[in-house]
Amino acid sequence: MPSARLLVLFGSQTGTAQDVSERLGREARRRQLSCRVEELDSYPVVNLINEPLVIFVCATTGQGDPPDNMKSFWRFIFRRSLPSTALRQMDFAVLGLGDSSYAKFNFVAKKLHRRLLQLGGSALLPVCLGDDQHELGPDAAIDPWLQDLWEKVLGPHPVPLNLDLSPPGVLWPSKFTLQFLKDTPSSGPEELCAAGTDPQGPPSELQPFLAPMVSNQRVTGPSHFQDVRLIEFDISGSGISFAAGDLVLIQPENTASHVQQFCQALGLDPEQHFTLQPREPGVTCPTRLPQPCSVRRLVSQYLDIASVPRRSFFELLACLSPHELEREKLWEFGSARGQEELCEYCTRPRRTALEVLCDFPHTAAAVPPDYLLDLLPLIRPRAFSIASSLRAHPSRLQILVAVVQYQTRLREPRRGLCSSWLASLDPAQGPVRVPLWVRSGGLTFPKTPDVPVIMVGPGTGVAPFRAAIQERVAQGETGNVLFFGCRRRDQDFYWEAEWEQLQARGCLTLVTAFSREQEQKVYVQHRLRALGPLVWELLDGRGAHFYLAGNAKYMPADVCDTLLSIFREEGGLSDPDAAAYLAQLQRTLRFQTETWA
């Protein structure tokens, strides 16, 4: 009896959905199921009509948005021309990953589940709603859901009687092998370009532009709790162009001290070079990784040793461990019953993969190099809103970066990999180059002259609006209204002098909210409500566009509630009509958001 064919497709923004998908793949193979795990946008979506059994694993980002690596699939699957019987041969299940503190919790998974039903698919289970806010994380929902899933899958597709279920402790072969070279290659392996890429092509993830850093300036007061940087890059000769609302992606690196510590813990020679080979046909090597590559470069620029490891990290370490006590503890962390203890040890204090390896020294020293890419995720690029316009700053690109640093119960402060790396770079001490490329963002501004724009950007959320205002002022457009919020005027009022100069010229209406300068906190939504008549007149009378950028947790919902109250009180709309009015603004792209966690 041939084994059933299972396809796992994932859409992942931070790597969690990919990690869950690979876990699904391992568990399927334990059950003798033929299984492929693929990124949604890499899979030829028209082939779904031939798939009998598909598990979709998808995260929800921002305000109910799909991850970047499933956006093409998302557009295709919601085409109105698709027939209602298109997927009638397919059994499916949807596993969602989200955060219940956001208004559109697991919106992508829920909407995909409904759409697959509309196209004739048969759901094996209700959609799984993994929640980052749960004390045990998404696994609290995933573990029982997977038990039900395998029962459903193995009903119509039972394990052949002559085959046994592989025990969970079996060590599967690594995805890749590292072939170490006897001699150091002579052809410049440290150039930042992946083998086989076209150096003449436009800057991209495969071929980033090494942009010289021109300046790195702290723009918050010395006593302010947060270090925020205005960083400028020279993009002359790069071929990079961008518009207001676009994003720049930056590929960060691990610190030299962490790289050295990692190599010592695993007994690796950082100067040794290797080539990477896939173990199975059909598996491709990471496209960004050069061939050949040094161990130092692999650890510095590719392996995310500063990430908080997921459950699969502990499962694999347990399989690799030769030390009985360490192995038992790792098995506990990797098991369903050990998730509360894992949360206490790792997730809650944000302990990094490097710190875990140092806590399990006998295991770390026994990790075969072939398993490095199975054990650790690749460093992901970080996206920043571009904070300048080429019209105002030709050949320059500026970003506003809040340096992430916070304390947990661990002795060492937790630091954001990319923001801390950028903050550490000082062009005054010598040339600094940063790998970057640009992509279209989620905000598009009106091309028609004289269309007013209302922009709400508290904190670093103001960055894309500075680019938009510079661009619009250069084109002679004066209908710019900016609501900016921060803690104190003298500590974190970004670009104060620039805004005041534009306001004096009649190019900008600036409305500020300084939350800590009076006994009762004042936020942007309070200032928005106070100017309700102006907001309603601009939106309903003059066809203004409304933009919102900043932290996704509470502010967007508060601003939307404020808008609804303005529509009711200034426009005389009923509750349903106010909600419909806001929905219409969203549909026509007159209400746009760019938010982040």
From Swiss-Prot:
Localization (cell) = Cytoplasm, Perinuclear region
Q: Which residues form the FAD-binding FR-type domain?
A: 206-446
Q: Which Pfam families match?
A: FAD_binding_1, Flavodoxin_1, NAD_binding_1
**What is the protein name given in its UniProt record?**
NADPH-dependent diflavin oxidoreductase 1
Question: Could you say which protein family the record assigns here?
Answer: Belongs to the NADPH-dependent diflavin oxidoreductase NDOR1 family. In the N-terminal section; belongs to the flavodoxin family.
The keyword DNA repair is assigned to this record: no
* Residues given in the record as FAD binding sites: R350, R382, A383, F384, S385, G416, L417, C418, S419, W596
Catalytic EC class: oxidoreductase
Which reaction does this enzyme catalyse, per its entry? 2 oxidized [2Fe-2S]-[protein] + NADPH = 2 reduced [2Fe-2S]-[protein] + NADP(+) + H(+)
Domain of life of the source:
Eukaryota
Origin species, per record, is: Bos taurus
User: In which residues is NADP(+) bound?
Assistant: T460, S515, R516, K521, V522, Y523, V524, Q525, D558
Cofactors that this protein relies on: FAD; FMN
Q: Which terms in the Gene Ontology molecular function aspect does this entry carry?
A: electron transfer activity; flavin adenine dinucleotide binding; FMN binding; NADP binding; NADPH-hemoprotein reductase activity; NADPH-iron-sulfur [2Fe-2S] protein oxidoreductase activity; oxidoreductase activity; oxidoreductase activity, acting on NAD(P)H, heme protein as acceptor
Which keywords does the record carry? Cytoplasm, FAD, Flavoprotein, FMN, NADP, Oxidoreductase
Binding residues for FMN, per the UniProt record? 12-17, 59-62, 97-106, 132
Q: What is its EC number?
A: 1.18.1.-
> What does this protein do, in the record's words?
NADPH-dependent reductase which is a central component of the cytosolic iron-sulfur (Fe-S) protein assembly (CIA) machinery. Transfers electrons from NADPH via its FAD and FMN prosthetic groups to the [2Fe-2S] cluster of CIAPIN1, another key component of the CIA machinery. In turn, this reduced cluster provides electrons for assembly of cytosolic iron-sulfur cluster proteins. It can also reduce the [2Fe-2S] cluster of CISD1 and activate this protein implicated in Fe/S cluster repair. In vitro can fully activate methionine synthase/MTR in the presence of soluble cytochrome b5/CYB5A.
InterPro entries, per database record: CysJ-like_FAD-binding, FAD-bd_FR_type, Flavdoxin-like, Flavodoxin/NO_synth, Flavoprot_Pyr_Nucl_cyt_Rdtase, Flavoprotein-like_sf, FNR_nucleotide-bd, NADPH_Cyt_P450_Rdtase_alpha
Residue limits of the Flavodoxin-like domain?
A: 6-150
User: Its quaternary structure?
Assistant: Interacts with CIAPIN1; as part of the cytosolic iron-sulfur (Fe-S) protein assembly (CIA) machinery. Interacts with DCPS.
Give me the gene this protein comes from. NDOR1
